[in-house]
Amino acid sequence: MAAARHSTLDFMLGAKADGETILKGLQSIFQEQGMAESVHTWQDHGYLATYTNKNGSFANLRIYPHGLVLLDLQSYDGDAQGKEEIDSILNKVEERMKELSQDSTGRVKRLPPIVRGGAIDRYWPTADGRLVEYDIDEVVYDEDSPYQNIKILHSKQFGNILILSGDVNLAESDLAYTRAIMGSGKEDYTGKDVLILGGGDGGILCEIVKLKPKMVTMVEIDQMVIDGCKKYMRKTCGDVLDNLKGDCYQVLIEDCIPVLKRYAKEGREFDYVINDLTAVPISTSPEEDSTWEFLRLILDLSMKVLKQDGKYFTQGNCVNLTEALSLYEEQLGRLYCPVEFSKEIVCVPSYLELWVFYTVWKKAKP
């Protein structure tokens, strides 16, 4: 599958740019490649030169008067000869700019090329909006369920990564996530009743079952997540997803809201409730309102099925999203019962950003 390879080269000159001199100095590099030239000029805004090749590759050279010079080149990623030509152009432009600027170049920045439209999507944003290129080399699983798109991609560093509707959820390398959302090794699960909301990758269930609980109930709405993970995420889930019932656990393929309401009505209580459903929304925009309402409902229902001395564990979001985390903490003060909370910041390998986890418990009755 042919893809577009987008390369960039930036110069920040130490003085104002003589656009005409730079343009004339670089023209021969593109002409040597047989590229046709089109130049636009603005009296106070510099130059834009566009160079096109017969093979479809092209380059944009933008020269700003204040000293910023930008070069963008695009070619077919599958064209080995075209790649060599682009690399040659970049090298020659960098050398020529050093000559033209007479060593007044304050900064040169050459980023790795971005490959767009490839068979394997290697680019995923962090929660706070930064672009990350993963070392993805294989699409292991890609299916649409009635609820979401499910991808499992293989990373050379992180192993298989579960991605749900564009959000990086968990990689085989991410035991740190599972440990954090279970209390970071500080809890004794022996003989305890545990409720997991979500958790379709099986990581939490797999780790808790090892700790000899009385019973673990996991409520996951999406059977296809379980099916994909039990086949391709076995380093995370082991064999616990092979059967929906075991000696000390059961997996319910249901929406957790009706289940929580049913348990609350029955008066059923748990020592631990672990919410692995979704991260804290990043804003209070109208598009996010339904997610905030969902989180508030989950919190209230979870407190109703949590024992007085029990604990509720959940993820927050990226540590940089301070406003979103503060809004979540405000919600904790609006529950039907008074609660206290603590938080922990953990490095989850595949997230490539620090992540916040919460522990919530009911205030002691006077």
From Swiss-Prot:
Consequence the record notes for mutating G67E: In MRXSSR; a reduced spermine/spermidine ratio is observed in patient lymphoblastoid cells consistent with impaired spermine biosynthesis
Residues bearing the modification N-acetylalanine: A2
Transferase keyword on record: yes
Catalytic activity: S-adenosyl 3-(methylsulfanyl)propylamine + spermidine = spermine + S-methyl-5'-thioadenosine + H(+)
Pfam families linked: Spermine_synt_N, Spermine_synth, SpmSyn_N
Biochemical pathway: Amine and polyamine biosynthesis; spermine biosynthesis; spermine from spermidine: step 1/1
Keywords carried by this UniProt record: Acetylation, Intellectual disability, Phosphoprotein, Polyamine biosynthesis, Transferase
Family: Belongs to the spermidine/spermine synthase family.
Name of the protein this chain belongs to: Spermine synthase
Originating species: Homo sapiens (Human)
Name of the gene this protein is made from: SMS
